[in-house]
Amino acid sequence: NNTHSDSWAMEQMKYTTYREPSLDAVDHYHRYEQDIVMMADAGFNAYRFSVEWARIEPEEGKFDDSEIEHYRDVIACCRKYGLEPMVTLHHFSSPKWIITKGGWEADSIVEDFKNYVIYVIEHLGKDLHYINTINEANMRLQFARIMEQYSKSAMQRRKDCKSSTNASENLQIGVDVKKMMELQKKMFEEAREVFNLPEGMQVNNFHSPGSRHGDDLIMQAHMAARDAIKERFPDMQVGLTLSLHDFQALPGGEEQMEKLWDEEFRHYLPAIAKDDFIGVQNYTRELVGPQGSFPVPVGADITQSGYEFYPEGLELSLIHI
């Protein structure tokens, strides 16, 4: 019940894209020591977890020292049981006040994120060796592509008077894209009230389709955070993670595949050139023909999220990059 989070606020909405409210989930916030013990017993030697911005800075410029102490305790617990803590500073959710200011399409996001990062690093930096600034930093641009594909697919189905069970319209997170498209208008109207947005402004959270400018702002925020961390702790290992499909070209699809790799990965290279590492999250492959992405192959194993179960995609993505 992270009540200052944009995700929590949207879970409570009548017209929501979330399948169900998270409530206490597995209550890791209070049971982290039990969970860390199980990780150690299972042979893990590191634990990547997130610091929740909305808990740390519930109101703009007002930081909660008790929450930063909570995360200090989690880090100490990792050390106690032999796990290397790796902190992620942003994992999808943001404070509600960030969204009210325009979210991840507002130029102010760069300075706001930097200020939050400085607070965290000045309190926790001496206890850490690895920091991931932003999880799946390409998510908003990837979301825009998925939504565009879904719209085109829906238009084609109406034109052909056919139905389709799946195409490459699945996003690699727990959001129901089909439901989002169907509820979009009502959701935006309700969300404007929830976040006190002016007429015409949409909710630009990390789960929303991003513009090219918004994509650039994420990279600016990452670079500002990285530089602030390095200024204070030069030896800190800093990077981000990207959600990458394993794009595979069908005959004639080579040019389209290269365009997708440019969009999903290569255009970020200048922004991450000074990073110490890159994290890769891969969930599936995507078959690409001359006209774009193809549906999941008939007979393929499908995950609960609706995309093809294809473990080899991680290896092939790493080889590609």
Question: Where is each model-derived feature located?
Answer:
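Juxtamembrane transmembrane-helix termini
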Residues: 49-54
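Non-catalytic scaffold segments within catalytic domains of secreted glycoside hydrolases
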Residues: 1-30, 36, 40-45, 56-319
